[in-house]
Amino acid sequence: FDEKMESESMDYLEKAAEIIKDPVEKGQIYYRIADLSFENKVYDRALASYQQVIKNSQSKKQVQEANLRSVQIYRLNGDLDKATKTIKDMLLDDVFKPIFGSLELELVKLYDQQKMFTEANNRLESILQDYPKTKASAEAYYILGNYAISQEWDLLEALEHFGMVSREFSKSMYVKPALLRVKEITSYDNLIAQYDSYMDRLLVVDTLGVPSLTIKDKNDFATVIYGLAELESFHFSRIDSGIVYLNQLIQLTPNSPLYPKALYAKAIILDEQGYYK
């Protein structure tokens, strides 16, 4: 019902935009239609409306934004060649200079979508050099931080990149996600230190042959292992490593209260990976 109402509202706005003669007002209405449609992922309508904004709006900022959103829609619709060509053409036109940084980031996302990670990294590094202290450079640092995790598994480098986000542009929408990433990495490092300590103790027995880990110790150890499995699987997208930790919990601490939860988490992960198909 809500979707139908939204669609009808857009229909009425489009009719109004078609009738209105004043290009300024016409451009404003089409810009509103385009933004709402983009937010609701109705990309065909959004693209058509952004083209009308480009044609009618008297605002340079709106026209630039409409061009940027248009190439984003090409990418989201899978028209990667068109998106790439359009962006490269725009980067040669000084009319679009205020959004050059954003266009460069769109190229990064296009490269990423095609798994061209070397090209993406090179473009990100150039963004840091060419557009320092901007929204673009802040986002570039955030993406580089995620690449340090996903491509290199270098958490120290990731921390450095995430730490730069707020320094580059304190109002960036990536400041909070970067802080969350820092928190996740810090938690992971702390858990690894505890994990190593428990693993060392697990191998130690006293003179009577009694293991050094008490029942409480094993339950605490299970909590550490589960925390690592959760971070690996659901935060860092390292599914194989997450499964390794879950298997360890299942094998080493079968009497832990977390044992059933580990079995369930493993089943969910394997199901999502298509293991049971």
Q: Whereabouts are the PLM-identified features?
A:
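Acidic, polar-rich low-complexity tracts and alpha-helical solenoid repeat scaffolds
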Residues: 1-277
